[in-house]
Amino acid sequence: MDHRKSVDFTNEYIKQQTENQNHTPRGHRMMANFTIRKWNSETNFNEDDYGAIPTKSSIANLLNKFLKSRPTKDDLEMNKILKSEYKPITLRYSLIEILCNHIEKYALEQEGIFRVSGSNQQIRLFWQTFTTDNIEFPINEHNVAGALKLYIREQSEPLVPYEMFSNFISQLGDGGPVTFTAITNLMSKITPENLKIIKRLIRTAVIIVRHSQLNKMDANNMGIVFGPNIFKSRPDSPNIFSEAKYSNESVSFLISNYLNVFPDLEIPILGTETNTEENELLNNNNNNNNVIMPTTTTTTTSASSSILPTDSSNNNGGGSASSPVTKSIPLSSIGSSSTSPIISPSSSSSSSPIVGTNLTTGSIHSTSPTPFSLLATTTSTTTTNSNKVNSIINSTSQSKSQLLPIHPSLLDTNQMIERVEGNPLSQMKRKDFSITHHLSTKLQKTKHFRKEEIWDCFLILKVSGNLVNVKNSTTTTTTSTSTSTSTSTSTSTSSTTTNQPNSITQSNSASNNSLINNGKIKKSTTNLISQSNSQSSLQLNQTNSNNNNIVTLTPVYILITSQNVFFFDTRIYNIQYILPHSRLKEISVDVVNKGLFSILDGESHKLSFFLVPRPRVIDLLVRSLERGRAIAKLTNKSLASLQSRKFPLLESNSGAGGTSNFGKLPESRPVFESLAQNGFTELDVWEGTVDLLEVVKKFHHILIPSADQSKCVVEFLLPAIPEFKGIYRKSYKLDSKTTVYKIICLICEKAKLEPSKFLLRTLKGRTLFDNKSLGDFGLGTLFTSWQLRLIALESPESTGNFVVEFLMPDIPEFKGMQKKAIKVDAYQPLKRIMKGLCDKLKIPNHHYYHLIGPEGEVLGDNDVLSSIGLGIKYKTCKMKLAKKVFPVGKNPELDTPMVRSLVIDNIIGLAWSKIKDRHNERIRLYCKQMLDYIVDQTFVEIAKAELVPKRVAMLGKNSRYEFYHALSLKEEEDMILMDIQGYKETVYQSRSIVPSEPDSSPNYPLYRQKLPTIRGVGPINSIRDIKVNSAKNNFLSELKDNNKQQQQQQIGNTNDEHTIKPSQRIKYIAPTPVLNNPNSIVQLLALKPGASKLVEQLKNRMTITTSKINIFDVEDLVPKNSPVLSRKSYKL
């Protein structure tokens, strides 16, 4: 619709105007009657409305249509009309390699790859992440392809410089085809860096063209999309549109003839190519009428005359009839074959569809040879029944372009290929054989786990049953059946084996063989499983322990995702158990039986045991679980960090049923949960950080000893003294009711040592009383086994401490130090050892380093040196100190919040401890300032009191009486206030502002202060008591006597109250005898000596000196009723 103002000059209008002119009288001015077209259908103008103005709505509609028809800014930037605001990113081959590999891996089957445009905004956002090689690919593969084109196009200098491309076009001439010589000369002039990138792009393009039946991208289409990016013209060139034709043809020529242009470029065969030579020949036959498909046996010219590339010398000449350049077949056309041609030394032919001969004239065009020109120079020995031209798939070459026939006996390869293609397995892709792909497909079919991100997948063996009970049962059955004959045993075994289900026997035999073949499994465990199989008949006959004494190993897949841990049963191929990362409480690794570990569910308290063939799989599994817990902490910050614990699972659980760590009983779980609420872990209870005596007393109604747990195994760490002859640990099976003193005597009896010189302590140094039994500390109720230290009083640090030689890294922080030998505690976590070592060497940031064991294993922060054999196998070792290499995350969206949360937690923890220290220091300063202020005010009051005697001496007799009377009333009020209970409580609470000394403990020696107490109040006297006790002089005694006389007079005059008026009662009171001598009054009111004594006592109370300590005020390590005291008294 035309919206411009126009005048309607129709024929009828002209006739009407001429008639009006004829009838108009002369002298009148003629006025043309113009008709204005309508601006909008909504506005109605009459013919008489001359020069009407359009409305605002019509103008707005016109402008909106004009603005909507304008191209977008991105289109203008893409067409080089506007200059892009984005700065180009430096071209790097490493990034080109990453992008091309991703496209070759995921985008070969994408229809219209590089041709279909993605989201411009998403492409720009993805393109801006190209500053580093650690990029995260988007879901849409078209965005990746668009970003690759944008990355090459936005460079300030193209891959082929402008001058070189202009000279290349001038050599071809006007409308001339791309020749082999011209393109080879151009590639030889390009810099090696740019040439390497061009080869990588051509390789990706060839691989995509080989899959053109799926992605619909042949060599011509790839030339169209890559031509403007590789061969660019100047933006200001007048022939920019004509030059675009040469850029597209050049890329297509490079793709089709890459073997001749780039002889060193090798492109692998992926096995998923879909193009065949037959399809390419049919396409060329349809596009070029002068090409005929061979249907009969043909003989071509010699290879020397057909392969050599020759340039056309008569492109512009007149006489010879030259057809356009025939499209060469790309390398992807040799996907399948039907016959195997044999090279012929020389032959003649009338037509050659590959080389591009003209049938009418017989001349050969000046085109570079295609990859099929090598095959075109051959002749077949048999008649071709089909139109397929086959290739050899068993050649030693890595590229199908170099496939040449090997031997005439390989002519029957067609039958073999047909057999292979008929197999259903040949139609399957590589990912179809991946168990991770199958499990992810299984999850996608579910409703709640459809969007789970899969991290890792592990194949392990799940242990069903109890290894410890099997060990105990097999030992008892072996002794009971030792007198039986071998024939009876074999018959019973064979009879019971038939009754056993086949599934259990097969799983046991397969899993047990894997255990026996694994050399790293402990020998006792192997014997244990073999004995369990041999005694299966006896186990089945025992109905009470049938379920508890059978151990089965079931193959299970553990699939770890971003939110959950899935357990897939391989027998039923279904999800058996789902464990969220937030419910995973702990993972424990057995240090004796390599490959055995357990996982504890924090909600259901279900403990599952697993076995892996390679112990290194456990490290990978633990890392994935720790990563999942760190992500779960982002939403629930109350979760604790997951750390694997390493200790002997089977040995520490002996007799406990193997259901818990550290040998604890199932009945004691409420006790450990109650301690966990107070911040104590199971390790703290095991090491004796908690006062076990108080714990057992508090939970005595739960911790009830049973007769089965009377005998427990206790391991003692012995001191490094010559009497023990190099033995550092020893285990005993003891009764839980045995006293500590008897145990010490038992240990020292064989070594012929004096028991009074030794003590028993926990791993953390808490002393066990000699008159207490181990059951009082929780043995038999909290633990089924325990670990204690035997301490020699002469050398208390010799137990559990060993010399370790640390090899230092060659970094500037250590200032050339090569090694350092120190004595460390073998049962202390490595993070404490590292902190002590770095503090001694004055090296900051001890958490930047980790220790490498003697066998090259990397130890964790919570590992102990006893787990690698220190103190068990050897008494000294060498360890290497190395700097940690922090990994780079592959998923910034998940890793960055996780690392940020860890760093924030560390900063908050350090800041909180610093705040606590500053808070305590501030309280100390405030208390000191308050005490200083009180002392200063006391001196001020003393200075004021010095003027009181002089002022009282200046008073008259009556004024003195009133002063004494007011002073006595004030004294009585103070005495009344002291008798009020609420006032006393307020005074007592004010004393508790200053923290008192901690209560004495029987385990640690503390100084007991003996301060004088008044009225049973406490160690600090009140100021009122100090004042009354110190200021005893005649003046105050006189005031007290006057008060007594007044009370007696009031009692004596009670009978005369009816005759004496209330207003005259004061006149009948006997006057108080007062001394009139001013000097005596000044002497009585001299409070200076009392005040000075008050200040002195205040200073003594504020600064309590402890330099002189009485020996009887120090507690002994052993209580009064201990047998140690009886032993010492007996010696005396």
From Swiss-Prot:
Residue ranges, compositional bias (Low complexity): 281-301, 328-354, 473-498, 507-517
Keyword terms: Cytoplasm, GTPase activation
Polar residues compositional bias, start-end: 302-311
Keyword Transmembrane appears in the UniProt entry: no
GO molecular function ontology, one term from the record: GTPase activator activity
Primary localization: cytoplasm
Annotated ranges, domain Rho-GAP: 76-262
Gene3D superfamilies with a match to the protein in the record: Rho GTPase activation protein
GO biological process entries: small GTPase-mediated signal transduction
Residue stretches spanning the membrane: none
Stored InterPro entries: Rho_GTPase_activation_prot, RhoGAP_dom
A Pfam family recorded for this sequence: RhoGAP
Aminoacyl-tRNA synthetase listed as a keyword: no
Domain of life of the source: Eukaryota
GO cellular component, one term: plasma membrane
Start and end residues of each stretch annotated as Disordered: 279-354, 472-517
Site positions for Arginine finger: R115
Classification via CDD domains: RhoGAP (cd00159)
Subcellular localization, as worded in the UniProt entry: Cytoplasm
Function: Rho GTPase-activating protein involved in the signal transduction pathway.
Annotated protein name in UniProt: Rho GTPase-activating protein gacE
Organism name: Dictyostelium discoideum
